[in-house]
């Protein structure tokens, strides 16, 4: 399985990476990507991952803006402390 982490807080990204490795030591994990711009560039130049773990609020916008071009077979799990994005996240996939 291939995963991508989009998270602008180093500590949170490392915690998530550790949890994923504990679940599946064979998992390939890319990231963390820290901005919408960086995420768009990565998605254009790499094959779609199986799953994306994305913080919503990033330093240059919201991750929804970068994920529009994601393959519809890619699962997206939003990880955020901001409940105002919950409805939009539920509607995303």
Features from the language model and the residues they span:
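Charged docking surfaces used in two-component/phosphorelay signaling
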Residues: 14-18, 22
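Conserved acidic carboxylate
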Residues: 7
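Alpha-helix termination/capping residues and helix-transition junctions
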Residues: 24, 45-46, 92
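Acidic, metal-coordinating helix/loop segments flanking the phosphotransfer/catalytic sites
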Residues: 17, 32-51
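A generic structural motif
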Residues: 24-30, 34-35, 74
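Charged phosphotransfer/docking patches of two-component systems
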Residues: 10-14, 86
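Non-catalytic signal-transmission and effector/linker regions of two-component phosphorelay proteins
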Residues: 1-2
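CheY-like receiver
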Residues: 49-93
């Amino acid at each position: 399985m291939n995963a991508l982490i989009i998270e602008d807080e180093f500590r949170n990204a490392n915690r998530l990476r550790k949890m994923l490795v504990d679940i599946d030591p064979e998992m390939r994990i890319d990231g963390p990507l820290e901005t919408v711009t960086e995420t768009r560039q990565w998605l254009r130049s790499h094959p779609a991952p199986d799953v994306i773990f994305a913080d919503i609020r990033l330093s240059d916008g919201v991750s929804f803006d970068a994920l529009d071009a994601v393959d519809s077979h890619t699962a997206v799990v939003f990880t955020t402390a901001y409940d105002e994005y919950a409805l939009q996240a539920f509607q995303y996939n």
